[in-house]
Amino acid sequence: MGFRIAGIVRRTSFYTTQAASKRVDVPKGYAAVYVGDKMRRFTIPVSYLNEPSFQELLSQAEEEFGYDHPMGGLTIPCKEEEFLNVTAHLNEL
């Protein structure tokens, strides 16, 4: 059984390029999160990760998904409205 190295390298390159292109649009100092049933994508300041109200959302994510987030960002299992309320409160701080 033989392997075609060129084909493997091309496929790996393709997947790496796709993953990199998804990360590029997240500004430095921000993180991508996916929220709600429709998995709407938001970018949040990484400073939110230290806030108790946001850590509660992270705990919910850990309970539901563990540390496996196939979307490439954090998946938050709450309604968009709840997420927007938490982030609006954090914006006021």
Curated annotation (Swiss-Prot):
State the source organism's domain of life: Eukaryota
- Please state which protein family the record places this protein in: Belongs to the ARG7 family.
Could you give a single Gene Ontology term from the biological process aspect? auxin-activated signaling pathway
Record flagged with keyword Aminoacyl-tRNA synthetase: no
The alphabetical list of record keywords is:
Auxin signaling pathway
* Name this protein carries in UniProt: Auxin-induced protein 10A5
InterPro entries xrefs: SAUR_fam
Matching PANTHER family, A to Z? SAUR-LIKE AUXIN-RESPONSIVE PROTEIN FAMILY-RELATED
Q: Name one Pfam family in it.
A: Auxin_inducible
Up-regulation conditions = By auxin.
Q: Does the keyword Transit peptide apply?
A: no
Note the SS bond partners. Answer: none
